[in-house]
């Protein structure tokens, strides 16, 4: 299973890379806005920093506009993946980009049928938002299971990229189901390594070590 970091913060990306827990990066307009920098500047810096796939999201809502943005972003590097919303115009754009050999990440997926459409259009990745579904009392991880079952039934190449990850349990469940990728905020990446018994055990070992006679 691959871990992507869901961030446009270069400092966070560097920390995740140093941990060996960053196989790729996903960004979106909201994350870029938090940096206070232009999207072009942010994308250039991330491309220079991270060797894995980097999702850059279009803001146009019509297919032609999406294609213009996608072709411009793709020029920044081979690892750039164009992030496109799961709407009809987005599917049109994904189909064209697939034929041109441009990698795509179809985002804002909230149903298995939507994910099926993304795969048929030729998406490289589909991003189901598990946390947002949980927020409205639906089962985000059941959606992941449904999509994976459909993709396996028909041998689709599209990879399931679990998004809107809120806590370590989302990552655990995604891994158990066999999802290809989880894109994770840096705060949750840090939580993955934590367990109260680990902390308590380390504290005891260090306390006992102090009792060992020193020469």
From Swiss-Prot:
Q: Where in the cell is it found?
A: Cytoplasm
Tell me the route in metabolism or biology where this protein functions. Answer: Carbohydrate degradation; pentose phosphate pathway; D-glyceraldehyde 3-phosphate and beta-D-fructose 6-phosphate from D-ribose 5-phosphate and D-xylulose 5-phosphate (non-oxidative stage): step 2/3
GO CC terms of this entry: cytoplasm
- Which Pfam families does the protein's record reference? TAL_FSA
SUPFAM superfamilies attached to this UniProt entry: Aldolase
Q: Which Gene3D superfamilies match?
A: Aldolase class I
Which reaction equations make up its catalytic activity? D-sedoheptulose 7-phosphate + D-glyceraldehyde 3-phosphate = D-erythrose 4-phosphate + beta-D-fructose 6-phosphate
Q: What does the record list as GO biological process?
A: carbohydrate metabolic process; pentose-phosphate shunt
Write out the catalytic residues in the record. 83 (schiff-base intermediate with substrate)
One MF term in the entry's GO annotations: aldehyde-lyase activity
Its EC number is: 2.2.1.2
Please tell me whether the keyword Cytoplasm is annotated for this protein. Answer: yes
Tell me which UniProt keywords the record has, alphabetically. Cytoplasm, Pentose shunt, Schiff base, Transferase
Top enzyme class, one word, equals transferase
Q: Which family does it belong to?
A: Belongs to the transaldolase family. Type 3B subfamily.
Q: What does this protein do?
A: Transaldolase is important for the balance of metabolites in the pentose-phosphate pathway.
What name has this protein been given in UniProt?
A: Probable transaldolase
Taxonomy, top ranks, is: Bacteria, Pseudomonadati, Myxococcota, Myxococcia, Myxococcales
């Amino acid at each position: 299973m691959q871990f992507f970091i869901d961030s446009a913060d270069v400092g966070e990306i560097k920390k995740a890379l140093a941990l060996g827990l960053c196989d790729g990066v996903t960004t979106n307009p909201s994350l870029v806005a938090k940096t206070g920098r232009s999207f072009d500047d942010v994308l250039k810096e991330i491309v220079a920093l991270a060797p894995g796939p980097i999702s850059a999201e279009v803001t146009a809502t019509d297919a032609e506009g999406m294609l213009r943005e996608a072709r411009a972003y793709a020029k920044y590097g081979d690892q750039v993946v164009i992030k496109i919303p799961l709407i009809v115009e987005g599917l049109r754009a994904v189909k064209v980009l697939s034929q041109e050999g441009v990698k795509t990440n179809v985002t804002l997926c909230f149903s298995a049928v939507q994910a099926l459409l993304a795969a048929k259009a030729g998406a490289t990745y589909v991003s189901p938002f598990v946390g947002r579904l949980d927020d409205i009392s639906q089962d985000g991880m059941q959606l992941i299971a449904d999509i994976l079952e459909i993709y396996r039934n028909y041998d689709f190449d599209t990879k399931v990229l679990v998004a809107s990850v809120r806590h370590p349990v989302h990552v655990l469940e995604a891994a158990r189901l066999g999802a290809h990728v989880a894109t994770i905020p840096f705060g949750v990446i840090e939580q993955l390594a934590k367990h109260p018994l680990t902390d308590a055990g380390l504290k005891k070992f260090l306390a006992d070590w102090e009792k060992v006679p020193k020469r």
